[in-house]
Amino acid sequence: MQTYLFASGLVLFLLGLVTGLLVPVSKNPRMGVAGHLQGMTNGPLLIIAGLLWPYLELPDAWQLATFWLLIYGTYANWLGVQLAALWGAGAKLAPIAAGEHRSTPLKERVVTFLLFSLIPAMFAAPIILLIGILR
């Protein structure tokens, strides 16, 4: 899983770089910058998790769960913010970044789902990693 975390982190970092190029064509450029930064910060988070992986003392099932929580949380974070930028959505969860931008109810629900659903994943994964390191 260490190699997959490295690869996933590098892909997300690359997506963050590409996302930066899309800022000028986003409906909401401020949210576009936020999407760019999500890729640029969440990619290295996955790489750091990969560096910690050999030191984890966790059962296989917990390692697998942690891996998928990290992947889902980081990619949902990037995707949710990026879709909000492209669609002009995200007013409910990021009112300052969204500004006056609003999108269709379906697009707003998609962004809201992604951004709400990543919260448990992004809290659980580092807690499990910490437990695995301290064992």
Curated annotation (Swiss-Prot):
It catalyses: N-phenylhydroxylamine = 2-aminophenol. It is found in: Cell membrane. Disruption phenotype: Mutants are not able to grow on nitrobenzene. Coiled coil: none annotated. It is a multi-pass membrane protein. Disulfide bonds: none annotated. Keywords: Cell membrane, Isomerase, Membrane, Transmembrane, Transmembrane helix. GO terms for cellular component: plasma membrane. The chain crosses the membrane at residues 5-25, 33-55, 67-87, 113-133. GO terms for molecular function: (hydroxyamino)benzene mutase activity. Its EC number is 5.4.4.1. Catalyzes the rearrangement of hydroxylaminobenzene to 2-aminophenol. Involved in the degradation of nitrobenzene. This is Hydroxylaminobenzene mutase HabA. It comes from Ectopseudomonas oleovorans (Pseudomonas oleovorans). The gene is habA.
